[in-house]
Amino acid sequence: MKQFILSCVLSVAAIAPSQAQQTTRQLPVYLDQTKPVEQRIDDAISRMTLAEKIRIIHAQSKFSSAGVPRLGFPDFWTDDGPHGVRPDVLWDEWEQAGQTNDSCVAFPALTCLAASWNPQMSRIYGEALGEEALYRGKDMILGPGVNIYRTPLNGRNFEYMGEDPFLASIMVVPYIQGLQSKGVSACVKHYCLNNDEEYRHQVNVIVSDRALHEIYLPAFKAAVEKGKTWGIMGAYNLYKNEHNCHNQWTLNKILKGDWKYDGVVVSDWGGAHDLEQSVKNGLDMEFGTWTDGLTMGATNAYDNYYLSMPYIKAIQEGKFTQKELDDKVRRVLRLFYRTTMNPNRPHGFLCSESHYAAARQIAEEGIVLLQNRNNVLPINTQKAKRVLVVGENAIKMMTVGGGSSSLKVQREISPLDGLKTRLGKDGIEVDYARGYVGDVTGNYNGVTTGQNLEDKRSEAKLIAEAVEKAKTADYVIMFGGLNKSDFQDCEGHDRKHYELPYHQDKLIEALAKANRNFVYVNISGNAVAMPWKAKVAGIVQGWFIGSESGEALASILTGDANPSGKLPFTWVNSLKETGAHAHNTYPGTWRQKGGASTKGNIIDEEYKEGIYVGYRWTDKERIKPTFAFGHGLSYTQFAISNLRSDKMQMKQDGTITFTVNVKNTGKCAGAETVQLYIHDVKASVDRPQKELKGFQKVYLQPGESKDISITISKEALSFYDEASSSWKAEAGKFEALVGNAADNLKLKKAFELF
């Protein structure tokens, strides 16, 4: 329809004149593809009425904003979809619209993508998602998310890219580029400091400028400056007592000022709270379900959004000029020319085999082998006769639920079905025992899994059955962890505990005692407590990996694919091993009595740990976590050796290149990720013991070796100087630390910056 409208406008403009020159002369500048985009925007703005300007900067339905029919600008459609295109919902309700062609491929959640440590996977991800979005008529995907993993309790960590700003920065850029190469806008979220789900509308974050710039902003900055994202979504929370959907510091000063961002700022849904701030503090497009109650009961609630009729009225009353409005309109029109008005937009594809293949490849590269005692994995398909699968997460669909990322998929292969299919090829019997009962529901906004997971047996009977079957199995594979229920890996709330729910610890210990070939596969987007780690032979982090979940997990467990994922966050033993909980500042302190139930109440959360997030904190406190940041095993072995640099001294405007040799010393093909961290030997400010500043994944056949080089500039040596409000690289001695995990950096090379 959008292409049809544009074609009609172009055709009408070209009908009357017979001469090509006359046609060109009569074609409006805003439709003339030979003219610079900014000139076309100027012309369009000059033709638009006040009402037409207003209509394109606020929602007209749950996920769309209006175009300008008179000028041929079509409506603009957004959709949730960090890891799949969300099913269509009703115009003014969250229930699904009942479409028959809005199923999709569910790609792995972004924690899994980050765990691949492979920017190429990000590019593949973005391109495939863009094609799915195009087929569905979507112009903007509301993602990716790059909020930092500050606490493992955050219910939305599964949507993000881990704890390290450098890793997130590298991984987010190709995702954006891949998505936007298809003419679909990214909308990087949630800018910024949205690191909790609990009280997300009310939390005011108090953070040092240094931590803000070194930890919480770099991935957004990379998305803007390197990824060239066309959209940024503001966050629900407050910073300096202003909501981040209209914040003078984060939006006007940093994003649009310091970073020269030329795209649109979209409110999170219902994230606008004030007319004057919405007008003056950087918000460009307002979306949502409500606006502090103003829209309830109206004939057309969307007309009561702050950037709708209230804005028009304020302009007419002289409270605002059209200066701010024209900047918003300019940005939205620029977005239109990049998407809906882009004549070179390709065609979309839905649920294609190439998309399923991409989902599976990303999943296989992101699955992390955490522990493999006595080489219990891969399953020996030549000797095994019977494999027991245990756990609700072996059968439960994980694509439905979890909040706005919930999907309606064409197919989702369960871990149990994936293993049955794969092991059946070798004549291996696969048995199943439930083991525990967790969340038996399967409905989100009208999308249902169709599963009946009811099981009324007692905990004791469920465990007894699993243990009895485990005693005679060659292997026992348990799929446990979290799910997409409230207070687990789900939007809107945080987890209440670090421990596994549903008494899974008890089941795990019993199974480990019953069978020495016991493997625990953790399905989650978060770390969990593992008090039984020493008793378990194998541990795999399986994430939420979407449509091809069963296929990918079966490939890893049987050795058809060699695991190469690395953790994108530090897996702590307990909450007290994270700065947020060690300082006891999470979730914050309420300003008034009554907590969340008191209208207008704000909860202040101070990030007292500052820059010491994740491995930076465990290094500082000399804590040995359950599993380190960057940790991940393989079925083969690698030797990283011969670290050297192309110089011993580096100029402020220069670079230095570090090279190592990586050799596959094992018996099967595999991939290793070389990680480079920088240690500042002596600084004028307190600095982390080390910081990730480079990595590269390399694929090697048995016996094969390659040299891997990583080049850094002074940016990798810099810290944010609060006194001058700028980045600073101090002359002096540094060390490059190289290895394959934050706790396994055996190579060291000294150099100097002068």
Task: Label each region the model flagged.
Residues M1-Q26:
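Bacterial Sec-dependent N-terminal signal peptides
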Residues P17-F719, S726-A742:
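Glycoside hydrolase catalytic-domain context in secreted enzymes
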Residues N744-F754:
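Short beta-strand elements
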Residues K2-I5, V9, K506, N642, ...:
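Acidic/proline-rich low-complexity IDRs
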